[in-house]
């Protein structure tokens, strides 16, 4: 019996010792973990302050950036205005060159009336005519893409400079035909040039906006030209006055379509102007 009692006593002591051992170890580990958490919580703000807390709160940064808008030093608006200025200068130059070339073709037929010393030079036009034509070309060339984007009417053909150059060649050819060819009467001349001008529009444009703007440009430009003639600012030779009125609207129509195609080609690949809400 004593031996059995000793056996039970030793087993119970060992069991109690084993039960008391792990709680002490777990308590020590828990205390160590709590100490580490306290150290991290104390040193965390200082680390965030040292690194500037880049990812602490990204939402306020996004809101502040959205409210502030584009930065003043952003090159995008300047690039847009720079490209607009480039397009305007190119269209102005095209208008000046076309005015000089077409006026030279008409002088060969003695349609325009200038002093002999002016006609003897290649710049055989009144000084204000080429700048006015250049300004009109810049306005028309910038207006065509704006109307297209406003109406949402895409162009029916693939834009390429080869097509634009062919359009310019046809336009110059129409002017050359009006200066060189002889017709039986002015009605025949008007119908022929009208057919050629509509053919130019159908071949290189085919847009309703192009047709409407071409007709509007032809009407307004013819009206302004006749106003200048009646007030003595610009003169035509008397025998050809009816001849001038017969071909002038067709020339202005085809010129508007041609300059519009140039403006559309220049506007390709240009990003839209940024809007701020």
Swiss-Prot record:
Effect of residue 158 to R: Loss of ubiquitination and degradation
Impact reported for residue 207 to E: Phosphomimetic mutant, reduced binding to oxysterol
Induction: By insulin. Expressed at high levels when nuclear SREBP levels are high as a result of sterol deprivation.
Transmembrane residue ranges: 85-107, 127-144, 160-182, 186-204, 210-231, 246-263
All ranges on the Lumenal side of the membrane: 108-126, 183-185, 232-245
Keywords: Cholesterol metabolism, Endoplasmic reticulum, Isopeptide bond, Lipid metabolism, Lipid-binding, Membrane, Phosphoprotein, Steroid metabolism, Sterol metabolism, Transmembrane, Transmembrane helix, Ubl conjugation
GO terms under cellular component: endoplasmic reticulum; endoplasmic reticulum membrane; SREBP-SCAP-Insig complex
A Gene Ontology biological process term: SREBP-SCAP complex retention in endoplasmic reticulum
Disulphide bond pairs: none
Motif KxHxx: positions: 271-277
Modified positions (Phosphoserine) in chain numbering: 207
Compositionally biased intervals (Low complexity): 51-66
Cellular compartments annotated: Endoplasmic reticulum membrane
Oligomeric and partner information: Interacts with SCAP; interaction is direct and only takes place in the presence of sterols; it prevents interaction between SCAP and the coat protein complex II (COPII). Associates with the SCAP-SREBP complex (composed of SCAP and SREBF1/SREBP1 or SREBF2/SREBP2); association is mediated via its interaction with SCAP and only takes place in the presence of sterols. Interaction with SCAP is mutually exclusive with PAQR3.
The family this protein is said to belong to: Belongs to the INSIG family.
Domain notes: The KxHxx motif mediates association with the coatomer complex. Binds oxysterols in a pocket within their transmembrane domains and interacts with SCAP via transmembrane domains 3 and 4.
Name listed for the protein in its UniProt record: Insulin-induced gene 1 protein
Gene encoding the protein: INSIG1
């Amino acid at each position: 019996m004593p031996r059995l009692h000793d056996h039970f006593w030793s087993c119970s002591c060992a069991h109690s010792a084993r039960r008391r051992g792990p709680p002490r170890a777990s308590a020590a580990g828990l205390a160590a973990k709590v100490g580490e958490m306290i150290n991290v919580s104390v040193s965390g703000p200082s680390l965030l302050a040292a690194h500037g807390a880049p990812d602490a709160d990204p939402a306020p940064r996004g809101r502040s950036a959205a409210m502030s808008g584009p930065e003043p030093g952003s090159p995008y608006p300047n690039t847009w205005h720079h490209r607009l200025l480039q397009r305007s200068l190119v269209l102005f130059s095209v208008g000046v060159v076309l005015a000089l070339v077409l006026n030279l073709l008409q002088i060969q037929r003695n349609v325009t009336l200038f002093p002999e010393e002016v006609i003897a030079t290649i710049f055989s036009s009144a000084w204000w005519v080429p700048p006015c034509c250049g300004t009109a070309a810049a306005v028309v060339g910038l207006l065509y893409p704006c109307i297209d984007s406003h109406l949402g009417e895409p162009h029916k053909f693939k834009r390429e400079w080869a097509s634009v150059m062919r359009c310019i060649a046809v336009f110059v050819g129409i002017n050359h035909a009006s200066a060189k060819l002889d017709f039986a009467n002015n009605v025949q001349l008007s119908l022929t040039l009208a057919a050629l001008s509509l053919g130019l529009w159908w071949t290189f444009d085919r847009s309703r906006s192009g047709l409407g703007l071409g007709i509007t440009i032809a009407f307004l430009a013819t009206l302004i030209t006749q106003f200048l003639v009646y007030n003595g600012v610009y003169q035509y030779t008397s025998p050809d006055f009816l001849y001038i009125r017969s071909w002038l609207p067709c020339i202005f129509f085809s010129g508007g379509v041609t300059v519009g195609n140039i403006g559309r080609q220049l506007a390709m690949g240009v990003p839209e102007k940024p809007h701020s809400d």
